[in-house]
């Protein structure tokens, strides 16, 4: 975001399924829990919910057996904030889903999102006073200058949903407000999609995938 020239040169089109430009309005209880409890600081590894393929192969028979309701509820709770299974047909897709979900991320990425949520602004990673001086030459993490997005001209497709607890629609709309030429941004507003429904839901075949393909072909 701080280097629009680089973005324009290297990105032809941008697609974001479940757009998360910031988490100012994200209601997910896990974000609030991690912020309050500092539990992420206790995790000794660098990955967060990144499971080896072998573990997924163990989950598949377990989560497609009589215990599947428990697995489905846990996954739904993680990605929708409720026990509702959303638009996913777990009976049909469970075997595929549990090989790949949860997909995981780096622990530092999770900490960064919590920092952004707490600061209520888009900023670089906060290493702490001493390390910030080494990385940035200042004691606090630099804030991304969203005014530089004014001339953004990369054709973009962003999906938002009222049921996505990570990608709050208002956060996306606030971000797009920084862009002068809003015609380059296509916003696909959906109903009752949680954060993994964009990819796994049966209805995505009709409501999302064709629009993505058409956007790429334009």
Where are these regions (language model features)?
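Short alpha-helix in the alpha/beta-hydrolase fold that links the catalytic acid
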Residues: 154, 168-178
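Short beta-strand/loop motif that positions the catalytic acidic residue
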Residues: 152-153, 157-160, 164
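The feature captures the conserved acid-bearing segment of alpha/beta-hydrolase catalytic domains
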Residues: 140-153
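Catalytic active-site module of serine/aspartate enzymes centered on a nucleophile-bearing elbow/loop
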Residues: 182-218
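Hydrophobic/aromatic beta-strand patches that form the interior of the parallel beta-sheet core
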Residues: 15, 157-159, 186-188
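Alpha/beta-hydrolase-fold enzymes
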Residues: 1-136
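Conserved beta-strand elements of beta-rich interaction domains across eukaryotes
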Residues: 20-22, 117, 163-164, 192-195
């Amino acid at each position: 975001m701080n280097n629009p020239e680089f973005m324009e040169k290297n990105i032809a089109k941008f697609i974001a399924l479940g757009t998360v430009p910031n988490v100012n309005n994200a209601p997910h209880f896990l974000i609030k829990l991690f912020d309050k409890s500092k539990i992420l600081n206790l995790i000794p590894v660098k990955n967060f919910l990144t499971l080896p393929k072998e573990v997924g192969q163990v989950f598949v028979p377990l989560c497609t057996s009589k215990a599947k309701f428990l697995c489905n509820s846990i996954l739904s709770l993680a990605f929708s904030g409720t026990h509702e299974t959303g638009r996913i047909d777990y009976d049909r897709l469970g075997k595929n889903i549990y090989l790949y979900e949860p997909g995981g991320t780096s622990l530092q990425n999770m900490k960064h999102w919590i920092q952004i949520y707490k600061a209520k602004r888009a900023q670089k990673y906060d290493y702490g006073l001493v390390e910030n001086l080494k990385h940035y030459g200042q004691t606090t993490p630099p804030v991304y200058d969203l005014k530089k997005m004014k001339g953004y001209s990369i054709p973009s497709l962003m999906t938002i949903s009222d049921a996505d607890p990570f990608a709050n629609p208002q956060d996306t709309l606030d971000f797009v407000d920084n862009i002068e030429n809003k015609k380059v941004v296509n916003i696909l507003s959906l109903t009752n999609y949680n954060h993994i429904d964009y990819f796994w839901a049966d209805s995505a075949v009709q409501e999302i995938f064709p629009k993505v393909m058409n956007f790429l072909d334009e």
